[in-house]
């Protein structure tokens, strides 16, 4: 897969089985709790402010959104955020079922799963569970410790160490969707697109 992102377009949102899953295009799945900056991270990677709608209200996304990168060289797949406290138990359950269906049963050709954490909050139980699911289903994983601009160097290295330990030495990259330079963005894209 190529690393330079020349184009990024919204393809469609799905809530279950769909032909897009079987069209053979490799998928990069972005997963994480509500409010970790998933939409901002994808926007930062494609160098667009508004490809993925960001909202001040976490938990707005309730379907799986597909974005075609470089005319279907791959899809960036934005999964709904999990663990949002203000959702009703029924809504929470249906969102979590949708995420797990996609990761475990949909047979989507997932080339890489990008688990996004709020570096300040570190690894939550939900995130640990997600790491377990991704590993069990052999999805190559990279963890992005987002909102890196919120910590100083000392706090950052302590948090990164704790995240790596909790994730059993997964690849962990610090990042800030709001302040990332071109160089940082390219470095993260390289890791995402590595086989």
Please provide the spans of the model-predicted regions.
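Canonical P-loop GTPase G-domain recognition
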Residues: 5-18, 150-195
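Hydrophobic aliphatic residues
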Residues: 45-49, 103, 167, 192
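Conserved nucleotide-binding/hydrolysis micro-motifs of P-loop NTPases
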Residues: 60, 74, 81-83, 120-122, ...
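Conserved C-terminal guanine-recognition region of P-loop GTPase G domains, centered on the G4
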Residues: 97-171
């Amino acid at each position: 897969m190529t690393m330079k992102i020349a184009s990024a377009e919204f393809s469609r949102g799905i809530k279950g089985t769909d032909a897009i899953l079987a069209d053979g295009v490799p998928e990069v799945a972005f997963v994480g709790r509500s409010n970790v900056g998933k939409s901002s991270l994808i926007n930062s990677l494609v160098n667009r402010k508004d490809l993925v709608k960001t909202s001040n209200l976490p938990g707005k996304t309730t379907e799986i959104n597909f974005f075609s990168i470089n005319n279907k060289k791959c899809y960036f797949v934005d999964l709904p955020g999990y663990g949002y406290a203000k959702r009703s138990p029924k809504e929470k359950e249906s969102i979590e079922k949708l995420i797990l269906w996609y990761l475990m049963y949909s047979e989507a050709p997932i080339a890489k799963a990008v688990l996004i954490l709020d570096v300040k909050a570190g690894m939550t139980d939900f995130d640990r569970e997600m790491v377990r699911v991704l590993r069990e289903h052999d999805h190559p994983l990279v963890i992005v410790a987002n909102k890196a601009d919120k910590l100083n160097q000392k706090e950052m290295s302590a948090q990164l160490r704790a995240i790596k330990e909790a994730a059993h030495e997964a690849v962990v990259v610090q990042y800030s969707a709001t302040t990332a330079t071109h160089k940082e963005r390219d470095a993260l894209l390289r890791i995402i697109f590595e086989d």
